[in-house]
Design a protein with these regions (language model features):
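Active-site nucleotide-donor binding segment shared across nucleotidyl transfer reactions
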Residues: 49-80, 84-86, 91-93
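Conserved catalytic core of two-metal-ion nucleotidyltransferases
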Residues: 102-136
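Helical scaffold of the NTase/Pol beta-like nucleotidyltransferase catalytic core
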Residues: 8-12, 19-61, 190-200
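A short alpha/beta connector and helix-capping loop motif
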Residues: 93-99
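Short, solvent-exposed loop/turn segments at secondary-structure junctions
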Residues: 67-68, 133-135, 168-169
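Catalytic cores of NTP-dependent nucleotidyl/adenyl transfer enzymes across multiple folds
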Residues: 29, 138-200
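A short, compositionally biased
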Residues: 6, 110-115, 146-150
């Protein structure tokens, strides 16, 4: 018999599969607490990056706070977190260097991530993560990007932006000890699958 946690995970994965594309497009235009000009700038930068990454056939996806925003879980996001396949790091780096500037690395002992690079493109902060590793209670979890982790795409302008799964990031936040993020995702899943208010 499935426990509550397993049933909740299935509900979150179901949300991943069905997606929030139409709602996310509406949120970009009409909702959220971000300043409209600031939001437009971030979307313009994301569209520009997406065009170059996809043209160069990079394996990449959006994760973290921007993923939560696109899925309708969070109303704000601060930077653009990009997960990249390790073999594509150099090409990713070269593309972003042609668009903006690279910042200094700032390692965090909770992570043993093999590549973490900060960029600024048109005043928008970009975090590039490859070989993502989370350390939880002394155990290392390899969270490197894999093709099957891309569960859907959202369209920005004419560009198709790949998204990682919401259930996957719930697990990542749990390993990170980010309780508030886990609770936010759980409440969202409960709301979306509630009687009369969930997705069809």
């Amino acid at each position: 018999m499935k426990d509550g946690k397993e049933r909740l995970r299935e509900r979150i994965e179901g949300i991943d599969c069905r997606g929030q594309i139409a709602e996310s497009r509406f949120r970009i235009i009409c909702k959220g607490r971000l300043n409209v000009n600031e939001l437009q700038k971030k979307m313009d930068v994301l569209q520009k990056i997406t065009a170059e990454f996809n043209k160069d056939n990079l394996l990449w996806a959006i994760g973290a706070s921007l993923l939560l925003y696109f899925k309708g879980v969070a109303e704000v996001f601060h930077d653009i977190d990009i997960m990249v396949d390790e073999k594509d790091v150099e090409r990713c780096k070269n593309i972003l260097l042609n668009m903006g500037t690279m910042g200094a690395a700032s390692p965090d002992p909770q992570y043993k991530t093999r590549t973490f690079i900060e960029f600024t493109v048109d005043e928008v902060e970009i975090d590039v993560i490859a070989g993502f590793v989370i350390v939880d209670n002394g155990m290392e979890h390899d969270c490197s990007l894999k093709p099957d982790q891309i569960t859907e795409f959202i369209t920005i302008g004419k560009e198709h932006v790949p998204l990682q799964g919401l259930a996957l990031w719930r697990q990542y936040y749990e390993w990170m000890g980010r309780t508030s993020k886990v609770e936010l995702i759980d409440k969202f899943a409960e709301h979306k699958t509630g009687t009369g208010k969930g997705e069809r």
